[in-house]
Amino acid sequence: MPAYMFVSSKIHDPVRFAQYRKEMQVFAPKHGGKYLARGEILEVLEGKFDTDCHVLIAEYPSVDIIKNMWNSKEYEEIKKLREGAGDVNIFIIEGEDKILKI
């Protein structure tokens, strides 16, 4: 079942964060990850959300793959590149095998 990683980041050190992003663009696909959307928030339709954030939505084959990737020694090294570069919130949700009816 697909899983999705959502990331919001308020970047304080663009140069350092760019190094992290560059590494992740190579690392994530090795684990079946593909970026679905990335950019600045265009508009908050309801509620409160920091619009100074950058947002990323990535799809992976499963929650287990995300967790294994996250806990890998390779990611541990990559993650050091973004330490101190910004405030980051990351969460995952499990997708659906079939289209949901609304």
Please tell me what each predicted stretch does.
Residues K67-M69, E74-F91:
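C-terminal structural segments of small proteins and small subunits
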